[in-house]
């Protein structure tokens, strides 16, 4: 059984800049993919899969927008997976789920790091790709392997890390 632990983190100024870039890049990729899905369905009545969009993002989108290479690519891929899940949930014929919407800067900002994450209780730090040790308040210890870490920012400017074990 998977369990999540949410910790308050205190990133440095460099890490805050990296997080802001990652939030923006994930939002950009999500909105780009949603636009591609809507356009493909309206023009050709076809649906674009997650694998196709991931390959297109790696080849074409990163060539057009070089700033996408500054952030963790797995976080961008997880944004595409989130969109694919939202699309699948919409077409399941339940009335509880609406059509996926474009992401706004005003929405909750978060990104997922699915691999290469580490929590060090002796140093009170969390490590994710492209960001070295992030100071954190690790108030609760856990046992197990870290599956993923989700970094989020609240509207008041506080940062949190949700560790999935």
Segments from the language model and where they lie:
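Nucleic-acid substrate recognition interfaces
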Residues: 1-165
């Amino acid at each position: 059984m998977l369990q999540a632990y949410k910790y308050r983190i205190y990133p440095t100024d460099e890490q805050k800049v990296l997080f802001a870039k990652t939030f923006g890049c994930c939002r950009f990729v999500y909105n780009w993919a949603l636009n591609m899905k809507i356009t493909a369905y309206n023009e050709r009545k076809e649906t674009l899969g997650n694998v196709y969009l991931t390959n297109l993002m790696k080849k074409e989108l990163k060539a057009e927008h070089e700033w996408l290479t500054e952030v963790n690519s797995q976080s961008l891929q997880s944004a595409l997976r989130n969109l694919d899940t939202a699309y699948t949930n919409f077409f399941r014929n339940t009335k509880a789920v609406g059509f996926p919407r474009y992401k706004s800067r005003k929405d909750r900002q978060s990104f997922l790091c699915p691999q290469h994450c580490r929590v060090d209780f002796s140093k009170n730090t969390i490590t994710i790709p492209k960001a070295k040790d992030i100071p954190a308040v690790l108030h609760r210890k856990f046992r197990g392997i870290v599956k993923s870490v989700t970094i989020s920012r609240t509207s008041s400017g506080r940062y949190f890390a949700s560790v999935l074990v």
